[in-house]
Regions:
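Conserved acidic/glycine
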Residues: 1-57, 254-328
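Glycine/Thr-rich phosphate-binding loops of Rossmann-like dinucleotide-binding domains
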Residues: 81, 250-252, 317
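A general secondary-structure junction signal
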Residues: 75, 244-246, 326
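Cofactor-binding active-site loop characterized by glycine-rich and histidine/acidic residues
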Residues: 33-172, 190-196, 201, 206-208
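Glycine-rich ThDP/TPP pyrophosphate-binding loop and its adjacent helix/strand module
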Residues: 117-122, 126-313
Length: 328
């Protein structure tokens, strides 16, 4: 399958930006926190779930999407939001609970919403699947070529909404794609303790749809598989399931003691960092120069730093605004 060099450059910049962003959020979250109880003062209220190491899933899919395409994400949403083009300044302000945030500081990091690029996420496991299904149904009824993508973790593939939504999508041949990021653990439970099948893409056969498996967190394979799935969806060939074998380098949440996995496991997998692998591919196979790579990295770092500064300098909402936008 032909691969666009411009697409790969976009993927690299996006993946690098995601990594920089998650590193910055990890620092911000740790600020002022007790090392024992993980509570205390700091710019980030609430919990924080970071996607360091899972960058290929979001970048490899979203490179093929348009602004009009819908993306829903789970409680670990930063990489999807960045790849879909959510405003980084307002996203960071929302995470910091500021009035300039996407939800005026009331949603936090698990409830980002940007209708301008058709992106949403939520803290309920699997809830984004039927939301994306509805967007896919609307896209078909309107006669568009838009697609809807639901990103989930492997644990959510055992939710009833997963099966119900895929059954409906298959029956109506909707432009619907479910991307399963199998990062090996549902909180602390290994996939082998929760699911009998070796990978969730094989479940596609039960719905009569296409299933894909991306091994080893491979950015190039994710690009190719996503391209085919999106093209099938746009041309009326129905839904697909993609499972990517990925890995989160950090805990389930910031402050996770990670007693359920061996530190050597993380060390070994960090040696196969997908960002470094894509960087080497661009240099060795695509004729991209070190100078071009450096420019992309500097641009990404600058955008992250700018978003961080914007959020830190923004004001908190006023107490009298607490009940605004609340519907009962």
């Amino acid at each position: 399958m032909a691969i666009s060099k411009d697409h790969l450059l976009w993927m690299y910049e996006t993946m690098y930006k995601i990594r920089c962003y998650e590193d910055k959020m990890a620092e911000a979250y740790a600020e002022g926190k007790s090392p024992v109880f993980n509570i205390g003062a700091g710019p980030v209220p609430g919990e924080m779930h970071l996607a360091t190491g899972q960058e290929p899933a979001a970048a490899g899919m979203c490179v093929h999407l348009k602004k009009e395409d819908t993306v829903t994400a789970p409680h670990r949403p930063h990489h999807h939001a960045i790849a879909k083009g959510v405003d980084l300044n307002r996203m960071t302000a929302e995470i910091f609970g500021k009035a300039t945030g996407l939800g005026k500081g009331k949603g936090g990091h698990m409830h980002l919403f940007d209708p301008d690029v058709k992106f949403s996420c939520g803290g309920i496991v699997g809830a984004g699947i039927p939301h994306a299904l509805g967007a896919a149904l609307a896209a078909k009824k309107k006669g568009t070529d838009w697609v809807a993508v639901a990103f989930i973790g492997e644990g959510a593939a055992n939710q009833g909404a997963f099966h119900e939504s895929l059954n409906m999508a298959a029956l109506w041949k909707l432009p619907f794609i479910v991307v399963i990021e199998n990062n090996q653990y549902g909180i602390s439970v290994p996939k082998t303790a929760s699911t009998a099948v070796p990978s969730n893409d094989v479940r596609a056969a039960a719905y009569g749809i296409k299933g894909y498996y991306v091994k080893d967190n491979d950015p190039i394979d994710m690009y190719n598989v996503s391209k085919e799935a999106v093209e099938r969806a746009r041309t009326g060939q129905g839904p697909s399931i993609i499972e990517i074998e990925t890995y989160r380098y950090l805990g389930h949440f910031q402050g996770d003691p990670e007693v359920y996995r061996d530190k050597n496991e993380v060390t070994l997998l960090r040696q196969k960092d997908p960002i470094i692998r894509l960087r080497n591919y661009l240099l060795n196979e695509c004729g991209v120069t070190e100078e071009t790579i450096a420019q992309l990295e500097n641009k990404a770092t600058s955008e992250v730093d700018q978003a961080y500064a914007f959020a830190r300098e923004s004001d908190y909402p006023k107490p009298e605004e607490a009940l605004e936008d609340v519907f009962v």
